[in-house]
Structures are given as structure tokens and as C-alpha cells.
């Protein structure tokens, strides 16, 4: 178990993301992190890596560039960034890895594709506390002037609360902030992962030379707002906190298959 980390002012915090080094969400996260600690490092992808999942670069060299004190961009995936930071760039490991703030929610099955979640997961695999933060964006827009305002306002409180409790060393914490006005936020709720699948709306198009290509859209086959899930809670304006385990073994199925081999 991770012991409670109650004094974040003494903590070393590593930030990463999947939207890229120049992303607005990372800038918001840096401001949040600096309200918690003075020892903040940023190691993020040089370019956007949304949907990269837990990909690791093993067939190409990893280029990195210093972008200021304790600030680096890496020409690689979010997973690469956390590995490079912890195993090469930093003189000692961070006390906390925070990934985000993603431009868009990471709810339900999103977590399997998300580079934001993968960066946090890599931190967990390295034996570190890790939190993934995502700000939900409605595709039809809500007219909110500052789309990151809920995350910017509540992220530090959520991080403090989570770090103030012990949790399993095989678990990362996935946090999603609702897309709503500040006064419409209903609270912070612990929820299990919901279900929603993307990638079923593959569209074939033609380029100017009349060659076919495919485009994977963001249309969800079904958003199941089942009670008790992150998706249902976010639809009510709640901030959701979902523990995710890196050990994906299903013990009941092991029991069910006992004797088959």
C-alpha cells in the first residue's frame, strides 16, 4: 500500500500528458501543481499523442529536448515520457505522477486507448503514486468561456484528498471533471468504470487522387449511463474518481476454468 502523502509541499511531482507539451491542459495542470509543491517537473510528448494507449517506442531513437528548468519534451509516447523522466532525466524518482489535464473525458473503455491514463499507469508500474486527470468536453459545446475551469478549480483539492489516503500500489487514480458551470458541480464521487465503446463508425473517404482511406470517428456506439458508474455520475455534474488496477487478471474466471487444464 502507498502510505498517505499528507504534506505535498515537500513532494516532487512529475507531470505528463498525451495532448503534447504545448497543450492548454498541461499549462493548467502546471499551475495547479505549483500550488501544491515547488518541485514540479514536466516531461511531455513533443506532439499530440491522443489515443496512443500504452505504446512504447522500441524501434526508433527517442529524441528529447530541454524546454527550461525541469521541463522536457520527448519525441515519443506518454509512456516513453514517464520512463525517460524517471529512469534518465530525474536525479531521483518523483513522489507523485500526474497526467493531464486531458482535453476530453476518459470514461468507460476510453481508459484502454488513452495516453493520459497510460502515462499514469506507467507511473504505477514504476512503483509510484499516479493520477490521471481529464476534463470532459461536450462536442456540441456548452458556451463555457473557460472549458478547463472545473478542473482548474477542483484538481488541487482532489489530488490532496486522494494523496491523503493509502491505496494499493497496483492502482492508479482516474479523475474526470464534468463539462458544466462551476456552480453546477454536484460534488466528488467514487465510481466504477462504465461502458462506452468507440471506433465503430469507420468512414471510408477518397483523397484528391481518388485513393481510398479510412477515418475512425469519435461516435460512441452506446453511452451506458448505468447507476454507480463514472459515466452516470459525470452526466449529473459530479467529479468522478475511479481506481484502476494494472493487474487485469479476472480471479472468478480462474476459478471457473479450474480443472479445464
Curated annotation (Swiss-Prot):
SUPFAM superfamilies with a match to the protein in the record: SurE-like (SSF64167)
| Reactions the enzyme catalyzes | a ribonucleoside 5'-phosphate + H2O = a ribonucleoside + phosphate
- Which co-factor is required? a divalent metal cation
Broad enzyme group: hydrolase
Q: How is the cofactor bound?
A: Binds 1 divalent metal cation per subunit.
What keywords are annotated for this sequence in UniProt? Cytoplasm, Hydrolase, Metal-binding, Nucleotide-binding
Gene3D superfamilies found in the cross-reference section: Survival protein SurE-like phosphatase/nucleotidase
**In the UniProt record, does the keyword rRNA-binding occur?**
no
Check the record and name the InterPro entries matching this protein.
SurE, SurE-like_Pase/nucleotidase, SurE-like_sf
- Quote the record's binding site residues for a divalent metal cation: 18-19, 50, 102
The primary site where this protein sits is: cytoplasm
Which Pfam families does the record match to this protein? Answer: SurE
A Gene Ontology cellular-component term: cytoplasm
- Top-rank lineage group of the source organism: Bacteria
Q: Where is this chain's protein located in or outside the cell?
A: Cytoplasm
Q: What is its EC number?
A: 3.1.3.5
A Gene Ontology molecular-function term? metal ion binding
Function summary: Nucleotidase that shows phosphatase activity on nucleoside 5'-monophosphates.
Q: Which family does it belong to?
A: Belongs to the SurE nucleotidase family.
**HAMAP family from the UniProt entry:** SurE (MF_00060)
NCBIfam families on file: PRK00346.1-4, surE
Q: Please report the name of this protein according to its UniProt entry.
A: 5'-nucleotidase SurE
Q: What is the lineage of its organism?
A: Bacteria, Pseudomonadati, Pseudomonadota, Alphaproteobacteria, Rhodospirillales
